[in-house]
């Protein structure tokens, strides 16, 4: 059985990147929550 995490920079950016977060209402909520919490990095 192969491991489930097969790293890919492109997929990482597309799925969890800043632009991907801004594209949806839920994603914007995530960014707002991370800003409120004072996260140094908001997204991948």
Swiss-Prot record:
GO terms for biological process: translation. It holds the Pfam family Ribosomal_L34. It comes from the Bacteria. Keywords: Ribonucleoprotein, Ribosomal protein. Signal peptide: none annotated. GO terms for cellular component: ribonucleoprotein complex; ribosome. InterPro entries: Ribosomal_bL34, Ribosomal_bL34_CS. One of its GO terms (molecular function) is structural constituent of ribosome. NCBIfam families: rpmH_bact. Belongs to the bacterial ribosomal protein bL34 family. HAMAP family: Ribosomal_bL34 (MF_00391). This is Large ribosomal subunit protein bL34. It comes from Nitrobacter hamburgensis (strain DSM 10229 / NCIMB 13809 / X14). The lineage of its organism: Bacteria, Pseudomonadati, Pseudomonadota, Alphaproteobacteria, Hyphomicrobiales. The gene is rpmH.
């Amino acid at each position: 059985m192969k491991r489930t995490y097969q790293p890919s920079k492109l997929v990482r950016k597309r799925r969890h990147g800043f632009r991907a977060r801004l594209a949806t209402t839920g994603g914007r909520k995530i960014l707002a929550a991370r800003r409120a919490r004072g996260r140094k990095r908001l997204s991948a």
